[in-house]
C-alpha cells in the first residue's frame, strides 16, 4: 500500500524506465557483439579492410531502417517496433552463433556480413522506437523531456562503451 505522502510513480515514468532498461540491454549486447566479431576475425588474421567490410552492411542496413523506422512506428506502434527491434537483434545473434569454423573464408565473411546487416536493422528500429517512446512519455513537460532525453542519450553511450569492454 502506498502512503498518501509518497506519490506512486506515474505511468509515464514506468514506461520510461521500461524503455530505458530495454535499450540499455540492447546497447550493451550490441557493443559486445561488435567487439566480438572484430576481435574474432582479427585473431584469424583478416586485413583491416576486410574487418571494415564486415560492418559495411551493418551501417547501410541501419541507414535503411532509419529511413522507414518512423513510418513503421506510426503504422504499427512504438511498442511493437521496440519488440521487433529487440527480436531482430536476437535473430542476428542466432545467425552469428551458427558460423562454423569449418566454413571457408568467403562463406564465413558473407554470413557475418548478412548477420551484421540484420543487427544494423535491429539497432535503428530499436533506437527509433526508444527515442520516440521517451518523447511521448514526457508529454507536455518539455523541461523534463530534455532531462530524460539527455540522460537516455548519455546512458546509451555509456552502455555501448560497457558493451565494448564486455566483448573485448
Predicted features and spans:
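Cytoplasmic helix-loop-helix junction between adjacent transmembrane helices
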Residues: 115-155
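Hydrophobic core of transmembrane alpha-helices in multi-pass small-molecule transporters
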Residues: 24, 92, 105-126
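Helix-loop boundary and gating motifs at the non-cytosolic
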Residues: 9-60
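Helix-to-loop junctions at the C-terminal end of transmembrane segments
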Residues: 65-78
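Residue-level signature of mid-helix packing/kink "hotspots" within the transmembrane helices
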Residues: 59-67, 160-161
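C-terminal ends and interior cores of transmembrane alpha-helices
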Residues: 87-105
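Transmembrane alpha-helix termini and helix-breaking/packing motifs in multi-pass membrane transporters
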Residues: 39, 162-168
